[in-house]
């Protein structure tokens, strides 16, 4: 995957950004249940969540950014005793998540709408959600996430390793825009946002039919006190 777009990505707060968000949401509405069919085995994601659970006391407040269908992450966290709030742009994904994990709270919200003054979290998980943003907005998103964490709070994130910036690709029957980094550059971007990377894992992943093989990078990060 290489960088290839026809012009600079739009900025949040503009009509072009709103249209981009609508287009992304519509794409994930189309994908719906097929997401879990295309990515049936999420061992790396599940293992990363288990490591997070080991770091948190029961009853911790956790924000799931890009919560999708609620599986497997929100369900894992709820079963471990966490209080989970999910942010998701796709109304259909939210419906599925509320069915799969009724104990969690799911709301329609863009990552860039995150308000650190509204609520603070012991942990934030962002599995493959930041890749839906242009590179220009990812440092801002990481800054919002850091501000939404309590001092010492944990961020678990993952991205697909790729050199890409807001590239449109066919994805499980829809078309979405995605971004990627090499693992070293991703780590640098995260650290420059004021987060300390405590653990890095790289997973070679073979999705289900209709999606190409990929290399996934998982980072466990912490907001310093």
Q: Where are the regions that the model predicts?
A:
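Core SAM-dependent methyltransferase catalytic element
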Residues: 206-225
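Class I SAM-dependent methyltransferase SAM/SAH-binding core
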Residues: 63, 69-113
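Conserved class I S-adenosyl-L-methionine
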Residues: 2-58, 163
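Short alpha-helix
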Residues: 178-194
């Amino acid at each position: 995957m290489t960088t290839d777009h026809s012009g600079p990505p739009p900025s949040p707060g503009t009509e072009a950004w709103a249209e981009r968000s609508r287009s992304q949401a519509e794409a994930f509405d189309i994908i719906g249940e097929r997401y879990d069919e295309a990515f049936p085995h999420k061992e790396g994601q599940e293992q990363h969540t288990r490591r997070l659970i080991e770091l948190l006391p029961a009853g911790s407040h956790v924000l799931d950014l890009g919560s999708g269908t609620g599986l497997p992450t929100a369900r894992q966290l709820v079963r471990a005793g966490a209080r989970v709030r999910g942010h998701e742009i796709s109304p259909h994904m939210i419906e599925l998540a509320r069915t799969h994990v009724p104990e969690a709270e799911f709301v329609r919200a863009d990552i860039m709408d995150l308000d650190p003054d509204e609520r603070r979290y012991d942990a934030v998980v962002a599995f493959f959600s930041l890749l839906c943003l242009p590179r220009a907005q990812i440092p801002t998103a990481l800054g919002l996430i850091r501000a939404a964490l309590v001092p010492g709070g944990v961020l678990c994130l993952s991205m697909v390793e790729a050199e890409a910036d807001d590239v449109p690709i066919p994805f499980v029957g829809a078309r979405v825009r995605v971004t990627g980094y090499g693992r070293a550059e991703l780590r640098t971007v995260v650290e420059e946002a004021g987060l300390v990377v405590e653990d890095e894992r790289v997973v070679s992943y073979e999705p289900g039919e209709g999606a190409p093989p990929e290399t996934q990078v998982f980072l466990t990060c912490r907001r310093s006190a």
